[in-house]
Amino acid sequence: MKLINSPKLKIIAIVPAAGIGRRMKLDFPKQYIKIKDCTILEYTLKTLLSHPNIVRIVVSLHQEDNFFQKLSISSDLRVFSVLGGNERIHSVLSGLIITTDAKWVIIHDAVRPCLSYQDLENLIAITKNTKVGGILARPVCDTIKYSNRKNKTILHTIPRNQLWHALTPQLFPINLLRFCLKKIVEDKINITDEASALEYCGYHPLIVLGSYKNIKITYPEDLIFAEFYLKELLKN
């Protein structure tokens, strides 16, 4: 189903990019790995820039980042950079300091370059009428085991019929997300995505079905899939 853009809705996007990607075993951050002619981060930003509702992108960078300003996309008037933090939550809060009249904010991983325009549009079109926001996600297909942390023996199997893999982007009202993230920091709670902050504060974001191709590049083998999916996206 083709959904229609909503040009009057203003959204800012925050892309946390302060990580250094230890699991890739590189001497530079993985978002700057090149696939064909572009870095992973450039692919990520180009998809966000292609949507008419996204009026500004804020990239949260590591204090020692000396790669971003060398990218041509960094000179786009809609792209800003700020200093990120040691944890993802601090990088997102840094991005929320930017002055804007937008009421909504999208958070998207720097290393998810295979996001399709249609998934982005679906998230915005479906979520914009909620008061809480929503996320892209995929149903869990594998059998999930809960283990003993120490010796890794299986304790039990978790029913998967209501389990989802959380993806990004995630879209929320700006003021609500800011409030929930600050509450998480105050209470010293560990979270791995922004939706978890809303859940902690008693809110229930919507799930919007996303593509399995929207992978997060974490390990070297992920680059093979990313190159294949990007080739498909660019062809379309």
Swiss-Prot record:
InterPro entries given in the database record: IspD (IPR001228), IspD/TarI (IPR034683), IspD/TarI_cytidylyltransf_bact (IPR050088), ISPD_synthase_CS (IPR018294), Nucleotide-diphossugar_trans (IPR029044)
Enzyme class: transferase
UniProt entry keywords in alphabetical sequence: Isoprene biosynthesis, Nucleotidyltransferase, Transferase
GO biological process: isopentenyl diphosphate biosynthetic process, methylerythritol 4-phosphate pathway
Name of the featured protein: 2-C-methyl-D-erythritol 4-phosphate cytidylyltransferase
Any one GO molecular-function label of the UniProt entry: 2-C-methyl-D-erythritol 4-phosphate cytidylyltransferase activity
Subunit structure, as described in the record: Homodimer.
Catalysis: reaction(s): 2-C-methyl-D-erythritol 4-phosphate + CTP + H(+) = 4-CDP-2-C-methyl-D-erythritol + diphosphate
Site (Transition state stabilizer): R23, K30
Protein family according to the UniProt entry: Belongs to the IspD/TarI cytidylyltransferase family. IspD subfamily.
Pathway entry: Isoprenoid biosynthesis; isopentenyl diphosphate biosynthesis via DXP pathway; isopentenyl diphosphate from 1-deoxy-D-xylulose 5-phosphate: step 2/6
Organism: Buchnera aphidicola subsp. Schizaphis graminum (strain Sg)
A Pfam short name: IspD
Site positions per UniProt: Positions MEP for the nucleophilic attack: R160, K216
EC numbers, comma separated: 2.7.7.60
Cited function: Catalyzes the formation of 4-diphosphocytidyl-2-C-methyl-D-erythritol from CTP and 2-C-methyl-D-erythritol 4-phosphate (MEP).
Keyword Magnesium: no
PROSITE patterns reported in the protein's UniProt record: ISPD
